Amino acid sequence: MATVLFVKANNRPAEQAVSVKLYEAFLANYKEAHPNDTVVELDLYKEELPYVGVDMINGTFKAGKGFDLTEEEAKAVAVADKYLNQFLEADKVVFGFPLWNLTIPAVLHTYIDYLNRAGKTFKYTPEGPVGLIGDKKIALLNARGGVYSEGPAAEVEMAVKYVASMMGFFGATNMETVVIEGHNQFPDKAEEIIAAGLEEAAKVASKF
């Protein structure tokens, strides 16, 4: 029995957002295939996620060194710790997010900022940083209206690349990715594209 954390980074309704359809399909199929697992859903748009700033930066540094924190620093660190600990305690983590303006929604970026903690998700060594979450399974679920997997747009795609890079930096070696793309670029094939993506999500979820 495993604990799986589902992180949702889109508050648009499913009928308006393919990434939400993808997230919901993966979630439903995962629950069906793994009835004994503990599923925790985290909707980032329903959380209070202050941007990382001086109090959180100084506070996490001082906490790591065992120094006393100011009241403001302690509050900021407590927010980050809440999400970091939840992430660390999960055996598997699923991220559902769209490509917006070539990158990820700001709430997801802020959430990942909270996870980026020396001594927790990575450590410094003389040879460079080393990730610490290697045994955690990660799934990335992304939808984008255009085609970014190939062609001239491929090099400017900074959503899946960013999240995958951060998880890799944290040491993740077991990552699954499901992407639905091109449904806006090719509207005559949109239904077919989306259906194929949801079918792929179901397959990946059943084995994840």
Swiss-Prot record:
Binds 1 FMN per subunit. Belongs to the azoreductase type 1 family. It is an enzyme of class 1 (oxidoreductase). HAMAP family: Azoreductase_type1 (MF_01216). It catalyses: 2 a quinone + NADH + H(+) = 2 a 1,4-benzosemiquinone + NAD(+); N,N-dimethyl-1,4-phenylenediamine + anthranilate + 2 NAD(+) = 2-(4-dimethylaminophenyl)diazenylbenzoate + 2 NADH + 2 H(+). This is FMN-dependent NADH:quinone oxidoreductase 4. Homodimer. SUPFAM superfamilies: Flavoproteins. The keyword Flavoprotein applies. GO terms for molecular function: electron transfer activity; FMN binding; oxidoreductase activity, acting on NAD(P)H as acceptor; oxidoreductase activity, acting on NAD(P)H, quinone or similar compound as acceptor. Keywords: Flavoprotein, FMN, NAD, Oxidoreductase. Pfam families: Flavodoxin_2 (PF02525). Its cofactor is FMN.
